[in-house]
Every structure is written in C-alpha cells, then in structure tokens.
Amino acid sequence: MKLFITTSGIGSRLGDLTKFTNKSMIKIGKKPVISYIIDEYPKDIEIVVSLGYYGDHVKQYLELAYPDRNITFVEVDNYAGPGSSQVYSQLCAEQYLQEPFIYHDCDTMIDNLQAQIPMNFDHNFIVGYETNAELYDAFDFDATQNNKVIKTYMKPDSLEGMAAYVGIVGVYDYETFWKNLNKAYREITYTAPHDFMVYHKYQMFANNLRAYIVDNWTDTGNVASVKEARKKCKDSFQILDKIDQGIFMIGNQVIKFFAKDGVVDNLMYHYKYIADFCGPIKQHTKNFIVYDYIDGEDAIKGMNPERFNKMLKYFHENYLWNKVNCIDTEYFNVCKDRFYIDKTLDRINHFKSYYNITEDKDIYVNDVLIPKEYTIENMLQEFRQFDEYKNTVPTNWHGDFVLDNMLVKDGEFILLDWREKFDDIIPFGDRNYDFAKMNHNLTFNFSSACRELFNISEKDDHIYVSILADNYVLACRETLKDFVETYYDVSYPYINFITGLCWVNMSPLHMLNPVCKLLFYMGKLTMYQSLLAMKA
C-alpha cells in the first residue's frame, strides 16, 4: 500500500500565498502543510508525490526533511493552462501506483488520522467531514450498512444529512480507478476534471465504497481557511511570515526557505565572514538552509538595560562592527542609495497603490501633525544630506540584528538571521542599519505582532497606532542611545530615522496581515519626528 499526494497545481485560490511557492509549502504553525500530511502516516509507507508548480521547492524540502522516507517524485509536464487538470496530474503517476493506495490532497490536514481511517484495507473508501459549509462536494452514506456510500453530490446547496469530501480516498480497486480516470481525461473536455467529478460522473466503486467520517479537518485551499488554521494552530512559534520565505521546525532541525533563486548562495557566501557569530549550518540546497535546533534562551526574555548593555559590548568587543576597507567607497555609496532610497520608494509605492493611500494632505498620527510636505520621498531626500549618511561605515555584518533573532547559550550570544546582501554588496553592510533594527525590536516585537496585541484606527485624517511592548525592553532604548553615541559617534535620532524607514519598508511585506498599516504609519511618524530632531 502506498500514499499518493499531488502537489502539481498552481493554487489559484490562494492568491499571493502561492505567488512564490507551491501551496503544499504554505506554513501552518511550525511546518508546511505537506509535513502535517506525511507525519500522519506510518514511517515505512511508500510515498508518491507529483511535482509541477514550484515542484523543485517541494522536492528539495522533502529530501531535507525526510531523508529516510521512501519517496518517489513524478514530474507533471502540464500543470497550468489547456489540458491541465487534477486528473491529468494523477494520471502522470499511474505507473507508480499499480497497487492499493491512499490519495491525499495536498491542502487537507487532519489530526490523529491513523485512528480514523485504515492504513491497510480490502475495500475502497472515501473520507468525509460533517459541516454546514456550502463550498464542498459531498456524499451521503448509510451507517446501518457499514457506512456504504449511497450517492455523491457536486457542491450541493445544502450539506444537511451529508458529509463534505475532504480530499482523501482509499483506492483498493486500483485498476478500476485508473480505467475511469483515463476515460474522464478523454471524455470531459468542457472543464478541467478533478477526482471527485470522476467518482460522481462514473459512480466509481458504486457497490464497494465505504465512508469514513473524521472528527477534524483543516482545509488550506483558500486564503480565509489558511488564516483561520494559523490562528488555531497550537504547534507554532512567533514570527511574522513572508510569502517568499519561511522557517520550519522539523524534529530537531530548523529549515529555512528562500523562494528566490540565488539567495541561499549569497547567504552562504556572507556566512563565511560571520560564521563565528552564528550557529553551524548543517547543509543547504538551492532554496533551503538547514541547521540543528539550538537549545538556548531567547535573548528577548528577561531583557533589561544591564543585560542589553552587556550584549552590545559583547559584539563590540568581538569586532562585529569593525570597519572593512576592502571595498570601493564610491560603489558602496551607490549601493547605499539604492538600498535606503530606491528600495524604500519601490516598496511604499506598491503599498500605497494596494491600499489607495496618498500623501497629498496633512495627516495626524497619534495626534502629531505630519504636514503634507513631509512625504516619505521628501524625507528620504533630506536624510541623504546628513553627514552621518554620507560617512556611512561598511562592516562585515548585515542582517536582522534583533533580540527576536538571537539566542543566549553558555554566556555567548548566537545570531540566527543575516541578510544575503546590502543591495549588490554580499559580505558587507551598514552598522547603523543594525543599530536601527535593534532599536525597532525594542518597540516592535514578534510576540505582540503575532498575537495581534496592537491597535490601528483610522478616521478621516487621524490615525492612531500602538503596540504592546515590555517596559524593561523599552528602557533599553536609552542604553542603545548611549552606546551608539559613545562607541560609534552617531546620533540616536539618525538611528531612529532608519528605524522608521525599516518599518515603512516592512509594511508591504506583510500585506495579508493587519500589522502592515501599523508599520507604515508608525514608520512615517518616526521618520518625521526623527528628522525634526536631526535638524534641531
């Protein structure tokens, strides 16, 4: 008996969630959906996985996460456009499934599955869930006749007295299954056929189809259900997810995903310069980095000004921010402009277009007037004129230097995240950016953001924003101010301006999360107030 999972489809109902990767790779809690599926089956089961849309992501991930599993990958040559369909994707795997198997949709999560359906069987079965939702294909069954399926329905108006089809089928009569799928592929030309349509149209297994009703079901096939699943998931950690990146925890491994090709190569090149400050990397592929889980304490826990000062001095004394001289100054300045100015404008223009926001009138943020002349673009141009910007110092580290991405173990601080490059410069960055990111984290932390412990309200031209922060952590801002001014001769308002700039840059990265507007307006307010302080 085998397990068959199709991952070849484009996931069109999921919008931006599948813009950069496959729908089976959507993260719920600590894992992608496909891991929740595989982890419900016996470890010795043979698995067949069809690959299509971003199939290489799926293949790389499964080979890293399940090196001891017996997985056969099947390439689907046509997964989008004319002639593509779920049925065609299934048919591509026909030669590998000439025995009984379980078919499991890649957007169906069910807890405690082995206790609810058989892993070895001598009959065909279909799996359902009792719900009042009206989005699903369905069937009814006779509980007095060993749960025999009576009739199937294509998206009925009401599911009363029926069970919704969850996307799991046990195929015992596999020859009949493949015969009907091939027939459907030839005959159903008016639409893209899918598996349930075949069961319904041809009454497949009409006299030998049993129903199993599960007591839970998470459908991750649409945006609303993904959001709901993420809220309910107890097996999670606090991080703001991005649609083109992911961090998964599988056993004692941490697997980081980067959708864009080339990012991992750049990260690994940068890593050579900063490895002493980071944990050891176990392996990497084109789109993934793997390291063992580090059993340390989150740096943000119990943070206070005294511990914070110790942490800053630790990195200072270990030369994290020492100036590097092996770079052309003129080229560094060109990259600096692209990083701070051009990238910011590109991102906020996308954000403003998405939310139909203009900057052509005065606004009040937390009762502070921001005149219309102080657009983000105008403030960036003023920012460029300050001596601190002109005299930016390149250093080895360039990354997400925040407490949320830092561990403490045996008296040492371990950095978990670094950036691939500073614009086009791979191994170097601007230390003021690191200080600004730390400053950001003292106010804006993953815990409050992920638990939605923030507020934003908009009424006419008045916007109010706030986020819950730890008083002891907030108090560290004064420590940071003293540190940067004493050791690096840079003013705190300048650092604070870059913090605001970071927030407006973050806003379009989280447009599926209400935190995006908080970041935009909090960022603009911080930039404005910091600019006034710098000019005072």
Sequence positions of predicted segments:
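Conserved core of the sugar-phosphate nucleotidyltransferase
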Residues: 110-188
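Conserved kinase catalytic-core helix
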Residues: 273-277, 299-368, 372-390, 394-395, ...
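Active-site Asp-x-Gly
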Residues: 161, 409-465
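ATP-binding glycine-rich loop module of kinase domains
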Residues: 240-268, 292-293, 299-303
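Helix-rich C-terminal or lid/interface subdomains of diverse kinases
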Residues: 222, 310-311, 345-359, 436-437, ...
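N-terminal nucleotide-binding beta1-loop-alpha1 segment
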Residues: 1-19
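Conserved alpha/beta core of the MobA/IspD/sugar-nucleotide pyrophosphorylase nucleotidyltransferase superfamily
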Residues: 3, 162-244, 249
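Conserved beta-loop-beta/alpha segment of the NTase-like Rossmann-fold superfamily
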Residues: 63-64, 68-139
